[in-house]
Amino acid sequence: MLCLAVAGPVTGPQVDITNNHWQFDAGKVAAAMNVRAYLLINDFTAQAMAHRDLLQQDRSLPTNHRQILRGGTPDHSTPLLVIGPGTGLGVAALVPAGDDIKVIEGEGGHVSYAPRNPAEEIILAHLAKKLGHVSAERIVSGPGLESIYHCQTGNHRPAPDIGALALAGDEAGLAAVRLMLQSLGTVAANAALSFGTRAGVVIGGGVAVKLSAVLGDSGLIERFDDHGRRRPYLQSLPIYLSVDPLAGLRGAAAAIDNRYLARRIILV
């Protein structure tokens, strides 16, 4: 049995990878690996499944795979939001369903970017000239961080270098990182309100964990809470940081045993 998690919308065995030119055929991969059955899921479905223990007891997961960024008063009978920037912006939710859970496999990274201040409006205008529609993941992602830095400084740097500058205290690097993380706060709050999340929010993906040293004073949580009449609602939600480098693999393994995802298993 093989579970494959790929970065693109899954509607069949062939998937176009969102942020590069690759095409992926799960049936051909399964045949090449000589397996009799496979399950194909979105990569952030796998990330979300790695945090199912926040809704149901599961002793198979390590106890140190998350850090608490902000405590709260969770209601575990409601959806859990899992969101995170990497090469794109992944968004998924886990919903309690009897003695199991369902995964809402959304494309929330492609909602329209909503600036909240003049600096963000400048970034939006800069990208709109090139792209037309500017989705959230054009800003809240590794490539998004590069776009922010270029717009603010006129210089091109890869995202790891910008992150390293920020961690070293470089003013320009910090400014770019803070804008990206505050924008993540906006998108995460919008998603939490849309899903009716009360179980909490898990921030995953490869970018946030590498910037964990500056998360506390980045303004991310303050921006997350800054939603007018629903501030008390959002302030009640615990926020976690996923620090498990194997989260995707653990979640993919768990997907095979999930009652609802297992219905999509294809026999070769």
Segments (PLM) and residue ranges:
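ATP-dependent carbohydrate kinase catalytic cores
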Residues: 11, 38-72, 159-178, 186
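Active-site nucleophile and cofactor-binding loops and adjacent substrate-binding regions
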Residues: 17-20, 39-46, 71-73, 82-84, ...
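ATP-binding/phosphotransfer module of carbohydrate and carboxylate kinases, centering on a glycine-rich
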Residues: 118-268
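Glycine-rich phosphate-binding loop of actin/hexokinase-like ATP-binding domains
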Residues: 64-67, 76-135, 212-213, 220-225, ...
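Short beta-strand segments
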Residues: 3-7, 41, 81-88, 92, ...
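Short coil/turn connectors at secondary-structure junctions
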Residues: 34-36, 76-80, 197-198, 236-237
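Gly/Ser/Thr-rich active-site cleft segment
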Residues: 2-21, 25, 99-101, 118-119, ...
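Short beta-strand-loop/turn "lid" adjacent to the catalytic site in phosphate-handling enzymes
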Residues: 1-40, 45, 49-58, 208-213
